[in-house]
Amino acid sequence: MGQKVHPYGFRLGYNKNWLSRWFSKKDYPEFVFEDNKIRKFVKKSLYHAGISKIEIERAGGKIRLIIHTARPGIVIGRKGTEIEKVRGDLKQRFSREFTVEVNEIRRPEIDAQLVAENIALQLERRVAFRRAMKRTVGLSRKFGAEGIKVSCAGRLAGAEIARSEWYRDGRVPLQTLRADIDYGYAIAKTTYGVIGVKVWIFKGEILDHEVEA
């Protein structure tokens, strides 16, 4: 059975950048574990903010977070109250100095992580999986995606035996390095068990292949 490499890891250093940017020898395992805990904490604290990814940079004892979100107003809050609360909670929990920046995602319909989370939410609300997949694919294509592939795996429609189904529209060239492929994964917790949702979105080709900031 053919195995698929992660589209992001496949392009690291070519036209994609690392989500954690720091260097350490003896503290490496601790920092990796801490980065994971920071991301989980921020996503949980700002669950309704539509957070796609969180970039982490470390310099000395200070940590810089760059939050990519579809709803910056929810992250920042009125007069910056929400973002200050999150920063204070992070400082108290991890005993480090944090600076937090917010980047707005202007077209969440073609952000793979947000699309995957949206499909997972629909499945949890008992929307038929084929309808959720087709509706999402159509919306992403309408907003400028050159191609999209969606895969759902688990006890689909409450079936006794778990299976996977996928739906694709347009081109999704996973093995082409210059292709700008966005990838997202989410889990839908249904009454029948968990359903894994994977989304690949092809946004066009990057010809100069410079690493994105």
UniProtKB/Swiss-Prot annotation:
UniProt GO molecular function: mRNA binding; rRNA binding; structural constituent of ribosome
Entry-linked CDD domains: KH-II_30S_S3
Disulfide bonds: none
Pfam families (alphabetical): KH_2, Ribosomal_S3_C
InterPro entries listed in its UniProt record: KH_dom, KH_dom-like_a/b, KH_dom_type_2, KH_sf_prok-type, Ribosomal_S3_C_sf, Ribosomal_uS3_bac-typ, Ribosomal_uS3_C, Ribosomal_uS3_CS
Record keywords, A-Z: Ribonucleoprotein, Ribosomal protein, RNA-binding, rRNA-binding
UniProt GO cellular component terms: cytosolic small ribosomal subunit
Domain KH type-2: 38-106
Biological-process GO terms, alphabetical: translation
NCBIfam families the record matches: rpsC_bact (TIGR01009)
Family under the similarity heading: Belongs to the universal ribosomal protein uS3 family.
Subunit structure: Part of the 30S ribosomal subunit. Forms a tight complex with proteins S10 and S14.
Functional summary from the UniProt entry: Binds the lower part of the 30S subunit head. Binds mRNA in the 70S ribosome, positioning it for translation.
HAMAP family, A to Z: Ribosomal_uS3_B (MF_01309_B)
Protein name stated in the entry: Small ribosomal subunit protein uS3
Gene name in the database record: rpsC
